Amino acid sequence: MTSNDSQPHVAVTGAAGYIGSRVVTEIQEYHPEWTVTALDNFYLGDARTIGETTVEHVDIRNRDRLEATLDGADVVLHLAAISGVDDCEKKADLAYEVNVGGTDNVAWFCRKTGAAMVFPF
């Protein structure tokens, strides 16, 4: 753990989305002592704050910005994705860049730093 009191620092990608915003809310409710970093590119989600957590505008395709934002995270809950069938069909290149390239960036960060990666998809 990165903090002095051994409480985890949890980062959530896709935090402004339907699932991500609920996950952040649950973490805040059941583990208010944890440090939470929330990030999203605001492609579809529009939550700018969740409880007392500000959602940072970060695109997971930008490795440098992602690394700077995730710095210090012990766990990354990777919930960012282009998931709608229509979006994936109409914007196939974007879906690939986010779902494959962006996920690769998150995994790269976790490998580099030793952070755990939770990827439920």
How would you label these PLM feature ranges?
Residues 1-8:
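Haloarchaeal acidic low-complexity proteome signature biased toward cell-envelope/secretome components but also
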Residues 54-75:
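Conserved Rossmann-fold cofactor-binding substructure of NAD(P)-dependent oxidoreductases
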Residues 104-121:
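Conserved Rossmann-fold NAD(P)-dependent oxidoreductase catalytic core, especially the SDR/UDP-sugar
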Residues 10-30:
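N-terminal Rossmann NAD(P)H-binding glycine-rich loop of SDR-like oxidoreductase domains
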Residues 85-101:
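Short alpha-helical oligomerization interface
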Residues 32-44:
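Conserved glycine-rich Rossmann-like NAD(P)H-binding loop of the short-chain dehydrogenase/reductase
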Residues 42-43, 61, 83, 101:
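Adenine-nucleotide cofactor-binding loop residues
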Residues 80-83, 121:
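Conserved NAD(P)H cofactor-binding loop of Rossmann-fold oxidoreductase domains
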